């Protein structure tokens, strides 16, 4: 669902700080970060991409094009909070400044509960110390055999076409190095094309749920709001659906079908400035689809849960409270631990609607870890895929016949994290055929 915008995965912050301090102590000449130039004129290679993918984009589409090293504006930005604007349209169309940013995110879990995909596509200048430019893409994968692979890719240009029937986003570096996502206006279908030296192929996502706001209201609604927590906006174009993944990663096949979803974030400040923790769950079990997102604000220390449950594609429950109530719908979210184990092996999700007199319970059992990172001083995060089981519990505490399925879950804690104001570039690859890390630190 979400992914921390810190791309130094699998290495602790103290290691980065040590490299930085040693460089300063011994007066090492630190390399400047290269501003990678596109292979050719963006107008030329964008036309080639359109032709490769047979993209027929009418002149009536609104085109929003930004370059990775555009100067950030000093004036106030156009920051969209419209509840009826297409969820996938750019929310910062006039450009970026040093703090505001936005993200398009897609995730998937295989029907085995053992493979998974997490994709983040960013327009974000607030983490310039992570690498060159304002446009990056993060991709985390796990295979059934527990092999994981992660990458962060920085692109030269970002172009978003907002049309009457769809939104098309192109993050590109050349005619041979690009990512393209297309989301239909009704949010019923999304497609992501990958065409890079490392990853080629496509992912298709077919929604089985209605698009929704943080309060659980369905799109479109003129009275709903997109703000989920102070200065943080979040909506779900696709709370859940069927995903078809057909990729090749360094010539290794990555193909499966299962559960998928799509989300949007945009914020006035960077995530580390706005949040101390966040939790995310996406689940499909029989006729049920559950999406859950809960950030904890660094601004006021308050958690902002947003739970949404559908059955056969129809909304049956939503909640914005994580506290037991006799009036308000709420969600309880509890870790499950085996005896003498420090870490949880899964979670139990309890959804209660006092007004309806209804309750749903789902058990989540981990099968594979999608990624884990440590950032020092107790900060870090983990994501898992696995098997889910549950359904509605009736008044006599006899549940309906439990449904089985799969889930994705993520936990991130950055409460204690502080980041030096140095520029850091880190690239990682996990799993065969290459293992390694390259680190550059520069003032």
Swiss-Prot record:
Pfam families: DA_C (PF22903), DA_N (PF24137)
Pathway: Secondary metabolite biosynthesis
Residues bearing glycans: 78, 97, 145
Induction text: Expression is positively regulated by the oxaleimides biosynthesis cluster-specific transcription factor poxB.
Protein name, as recorded: Diels-Alderase poxQ
Its EC number(s): 5.5.1.-
Keyword Cell division appears in the UniProt entry: no
